[in-house]
Amino acid sequence: MDEQTYALATKAAWYYYMEDNTQAQIAEVMGVSRAKVIRLLEEARAQGIVQFSFRKNDSQRVSAEQLLIDRFGLKDAFVVPTPLDSSAINQSIAQGAAHYVSDHLREDGYLNIGYGDTVSRMLGFLAKNREESLNVVSLTGGVSYYLPSVGTTAYSMHLFLTPSPLVVSSRQVRDALLDEKSLQDVSTMTEYADMSVVGIGAAVEGATVLRNGILNEGELTVLKMQGAVGDVLNHFMDKDGNLIQTEIEDRVISTDLDKLRQLKNVVG
């Protein structure tokens, strides 16, 4: 049993044995079929997860997930183990995200993806390990940021990418591009996708936006002085989640945050 399946089996067992939920209720909460819940409960017993007590690490993981759900009003949460090498954290999260998406995305479903290092890595894992072909729709411009993660496995994916840069030279250029039918068609597709996965970037030294040359250090410093703590889809926000209106915001070709909130099953 791989680590991700082990985590799902642990979660299902917690809901069933510790919180006394029915299998149907667990299926609804976890977004899987009842048959899948039954298999996970069987795996939990077979692997010794359920022994009329919970192993400390397993209990801590599910408790952490439930705390996140309760604190932020989430539909679900998935906690992955912290790797021994801290530099591999994005890789670990990407693997967990790929497993989560694969478990919850129907065979012929459409997946929206946003810009970010972890999302890019996740897409690579999905492309290599998912048996069914993928239908992928981009939530931002910047084709060059999506294709490298797919590599030679692109043949197994149907890619619908926004044909534009992520950041352009002026607001006028952005507005002109957004009027193009090719961009509008992709934007419309995002509204009907089954799931969306976006990266949550931090406004820190070594941020993806710096490594990829989207912003320079001076621009990021100005954003931080204005209260920026991170970004989603290259929209920078303060600690309370409020959008920071800047000149850079006027040049970004990206799904706006109000629209993102309306999409189905957003995973960050």
Cite the ranges covered by each PLM segment:
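N-terminal active-site beta-alpha-beta segment that forms phosphate/nucleotide-binding
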Residues: 17, 21, 30-32, 39-42, ...
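Conserved phosphate- and dinucleotide-binding cores of soluble alpha/beta proteins
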Residues: 3-13, 17-25, 31, 36-42, ...
